[in-house]
Amino acid sequence: MNDQLSRAMRLLSQRDHSESELRRKLAAPPFSAKGNWGKRSGAKSSDVVESNLVESNPVESNLAESNAIEESDPQVIEQVIDYCYQHNWLDDSRFAASYINSRSRKGYGVQRIRSELMQKGVDKERILAAFENSEIDWCQLAKEVAQRKFSETLPVEWKEKAKVQRYLLYRGFFQEEIQSIYTDSVE
């Protein structure tokens, strides 16, 4: 459990994670300096001989297998997740709030952020609560994103307006927020 707990602490020290994201990362085998994912196809013959010797040693391979099984044991992962919750290192609500703030600063709208949070395993109730608690003016954000991409004065021709609209829809803004850009500029 200590290895998994140290992995969880390292992951959570870098940034907040959702529970399902952390669970998935803990279940995956960790990267290893001894792994063959970084070796080139033109390896020296001595490297191949050494790797064959390690693989042919049944004691070492059994130890490695038992460590790998222990590492991805669902009970151990569940204990680590519980420990993280008890120490307030893991919180899906906090993760959702920080993710919304981060992605909105990068110019993404509600629909895109909601979709990404659902992909990361955050449940709908927490996502909805996080959006309700956020103090982001989505109409103003849509206007700023459009002005940053196109120009300070937004286009008025139909063809150019359609381009702005497609871009903002792609970024995850609602149709009403996009329309408010032009109604606010007329008034």
Curated annotation (Swiss-Prot):
It comes from the Bacteria. GO terms for biological process: regulation of DNA repair. This is Regulatory protein RecX. GO terms for cellular component: cytoplasm. Keywords: Cytoplasm. The keyword Ribonucleoprotein does not apply. Residues 1-44 are annotated as: Disordered. Modulates RecA activity. Residues 13-24 have a biased composition (Basic and acidic residues). NCBIfam families: PRK00117.1-3. Its main location: cytoplasm. Belongs to the RecX family. The gene is recX. It holds the Pfam family RecX_HTH2. The keyword Transcription regulation does not apply. It is found in: Cytoplasm.
